[in-house]
From Swiss-Prot:
Protein name (database record): Urease subunit alpha
Subunit structure: Heterotrimer of UreA (gamma), UreB (beta) and UreC (alpha) subunits. Three heterotrimers associate to form the active enzyme.
PANTHER family: UREASE
Gene from which the chain derives: ureC
EC numbers for this chain: 3.5.1.5
Residue numbers carrying N6-carboxylysine: K217
Amino acid sequence: MAKISRAAYADMFGPTVGDRVRLGDTELWIEVEKDYATYGHEVKFGGGKVIRDGMGQSQRPNTEAVDTVITNALILDHWGVVKADIGLKQGRIAAIGKAGNPDIQDNIDIIIGPGTEVIAGEGMIATAGGIDAHIHFICPQQIEEALMSGVTTMLGGGAGPATGTNATTCTPGPWHMGKMLQAADAFPMNLGFLGKGNASLPAALEEQMLAGAMGLKLHEDWGTTPASIDNCLNIAEKYDVQVAIHTDTLNESGFVEDTLAAFKGRTIHTYHTEGAGGGHAPDIIKACGELNVLPSSTNPTRPYTINTVDEHLDMLMVCHHLDPDIPEDVAFADSRIRKETIAAEDILHDLGAFSMISSDSQAMGRVGEVVCRTWQTAHKMKVQRGPLAQDSERADNFRAKRYIAKYTINPAIAHGIAHEVGSLEPGKLADIILWRPAFFGAKPSLIIKGGMIAAAPMGDANASIPTPQPVHYRPMFGAFGRAMQQTRLTFVCQAALDNGVKEQFGLQSPLSACRNTRTVTKKSMVLNDLTPQMEVDSQTYEVRANGELLVCEPAKVLPLAQRYFLF
């Protein structure tokens, strides 16, 4: 049998079992665990290559063949690091395995026919589209920024640059909810909106659910009292939706123990659980030890660096409508920004005690940096803490799976949309991001939305080939017209679907109901389910998990930073 070198094989078909790939300029390496290819029978498109009539391309009609095949991609997902072909059909993932022509090849999972388009995945990393579950919908331009970074689902609240939206992730009331659902039809992004949950009686919350909310948000700026928490969670239990909470920084209506007691063991998603983004000062971080709490971070504190504390004070004053001339406002800001808890947050992510990472877009968060901040945190922890026990000096597969789960499958599970998005698995929406390894985490090479290319770096449109400068991210055909509407989802609750919200507001995009949100616990958070016994010293702000003091140094330099964004 003819053989080629491992290096030559990787150049031609991408890495195979035992090969390692560096993620961007981080110190993280992943190793291929499985390759679905049959050596010598790989499919590849191009002049003189395999996917041609009667060779790798069969005669099968499109009823049997896939619409699109991504060839020889290296998949990085919470479930594995595998090399495979990915078949797409009707905007969803049809199969992951071996593609080709079953008339002349054995063990074919994905049939290539005359109706099949090809995307070359050789040498590329494929990940699921990211999910940002903490969005202030302040301006529509956020959506393009997020899409170009590798995010394909945005969940949160707001109604434009109103003062309330600038501070809180709530789309309040049926009128605003309806208008935001109508606006959602215009964007190549899966969207879901959270109603305002701050009320002590149920009627005003129920009408938001029937108007199309996919969940509710409790925010301290609207008064997150034990009574409003209890009422909001009662509605969530009734309508099977998730509640997100920004707790009481000032401890006006109670302390962290009172808030945890108000949960009454019911599931809740705690936003920026470290507290710099808001929450009981100084000890909201203790919530990550509770079984019913699904803790997330927002990206300005990811990871802890020499600049983190300084920039937060200015952000806080602007976002929460504070006045630097009022001493009480300054004291409020100072109470929220603590280097000790921010440093501990790094380690809690590495331990799997914090389960999700999101942005907090334009409200103390950067919407285009969820992905890169996640991998910067993973890198910092690898450098400072070494390989995880489940990994070796050779590769960081477990750590990579843990961190990618924080912005893909775990927010999907938390908000009841994992049946649609959050991972690369058959049956799910084909929201797929392709990365060149050298640019992993910073700049995607292709953004596939609902099976159609929605965005990509693209050169001069008047050039003779696609690559001449200036190359920058541009919307593609999947971002336009009816095609865009049919390759995205708007998430609502089942009651809104039953109430005819699609017809009521004349919505064009498919709607999908969230489900199974009330049975989720911390143990449902994939690879991020640790519930440590948490202690916080109220004077020194020292944080301990299971008795261990959590301390790390701020980073002075990070990967996936300046060298990637000069242009």
